Amino acid sequence: YPIKPENPGEDAPADELAKYYSALRHYINLITRQRY
């Protein structure tokens, strides 16, 4: 199973948050693809 991305926290810089959210979206896509 893929590793869940680490949440950078509320006070993280915007680019860190953007990187986290794209990684999280990719992670969710991987999991949902495996399930179906």
Curated annotation (Swiss-Prot):
Modified residues (Tyrosine amide): Y36
A single GO cellular-component term on record: extracellular space
Function: NPY is implicated in the control of feeding and in secretion of gonadotrophin-release hormone.
InterPro entries referenced in this protein's UniProt entry, alphabetically: Pancreatic_hormone-like, Pancreatic_hormone-like_CS
Subcellular location: Secreted
CDD domains to which the protein is assigned, alphabetical: PAH (cd00126)
Organism: Gadus morhua
Identification of the protein by name: Neuropeptide Y
One Pfam family recorded for the sequence: Hormone_3
SMART domains: PAH
One GO term of the biological process aspect: feeding behavior
Family: Belongs to the NPY family.
Keyword field: Amidation, Neuropeptide, Secreted
